Structures are given as C-alpha cells and as structure tokens.
C-alpha cells in the first residue's frame, strides 16, 4: 500500500512548484527590500490571508539566523543555523515558542537522488508534526525535491549558495522557510526555517542537472526548528510594516 504521507516524486519532477488543488492559499514569496536581501525561499500555506503579513514578518525575522558556513565548506555561503535561530526566536514579538528543533546529518552512497529526498523528508516531517495536512506534505515534497534537483533553474537565486568545488565534489547550501496556518495549526502559525549544507560527490555541471532517477553520493546537514506564534491579524501591525512587507510582492 502506498504511504499516504508521500507525494509521488514523479508527479513533481517537471514542475516541482505545481500544486494539486487545495483549499489553502500557497504563496511563494520573494520579499524585495532595497536595504536587505532575503536569502530564505519563503513558502507560505495560509488558509486565511489576513495572516499573510505575519508569515512575511516571521520570514524576515529568521533571515537573521543565516550564518556563514565553515571556511572549509565555502568562503561566503550562508546557512540557516538552528542555534542562531533559537536566539532569534527569543527576540520575536509578539512572543512565541520553539516547540522542536533539529541539527542532523544524513548521507548515502551511490544511490538514487529520490532516496536522499525521502531521507530528508522523514527528518522534516518529524519537525512539522501536527501541521502535516496533505497539502503541506505536497509543498514539503516539492521544496525538498527542488533542493536536490532542478538546480540549473535556481543557480543564481538568493537562497542557494555555491561553496567549494573540486573535480569530485560540489558543495552548496540551500535555505527555505515554511509558514503554515491551517485547520491543523489552530490558533497559532507554525514557522519552520530549514538550512541545508550539502556535499555531493559530483562536479557542479552534473549537480545542476540531476534528476530524481540519477544516482549520487551525499552528505547533508539539516538544521531546522519549528516556531509557534499566536495568530496576528494584519490590522495589528503598524501600517509601515504592511507597506514595506508587501510592496511589489503581492
């Protein structure tokens, strides 16, 4: 019997951001602020758009939790840091709570890319927990698939950083954030920033065009947390926050 918690990878290979029908509004945002580059790809599943500004504000807050990787990995790559994220969470207003966090390594040797995707999905599903409605699972599967495939179309995006390269290995980081408000989350919004530090035993030219059927060896560090904040209506934010957050993005 097919596992209901898995969206078939084959369904999203061609267009990983295409979403099946859902009652929730799924919005991928690029927040354009002339004074700040946002290096988190924000994927917001919001049933009530009155809380969309809250999702944007949380994404901006956790941008501060991206830190440089080790010099051995790269000179100027940024990755979401779970430790720094815990510090940032304590400064967010109105206050919320970190209900789960993870700093975990997963690896594989010469196996299909789809196998690595499923390993990472298992880690992130344990973080998301109660928020895992079917639509959220589909978005999560799409995002993780896009972390390891379709990289040629993302290679210059702000959420991906290319690290050191050799004739046998390519390093990169990938940062994504989920903000979820639906029937499962109740009176809170869940914010789940995720940072990946990825080492692939392949040259960059091959990494850029990997598909889920290809085989590769990986070492991946995953850092993430789940932050729960009581729902905040857009009307409760100052008008300046509203203007700066959504100008040119919605």
From Swiss-Prot:
Maturation and modification: Active after proteolytic processing.
Disulfide bond residue pairs: none
Family annotation (Gene3D superfamilies): Delta-endotoxin CytB-like
GO cellular component, one term: extracellular region
The UniProt record lists the keyword Transcription regulation: no
GO biological process: sporulation resulting in formation of a cellular spore
Record keywords, A-Z: Sporulation, Toxin, Virulence
GO molecular function, one term: toxin activity
Free-text function comment from the UniProt entry: Kills the larvae of dipteran insects by making pores in the epithelial cell membrane of the insect midgut.
Family to which the UniProt record says this protein belongs: Belongs to the cyt1/cyt2 endotoxin family.
Protein name: Type-1Ab cytolytic delta-endotoxin
UniProt source species: Bacillus thuringiensis subsp. medellin
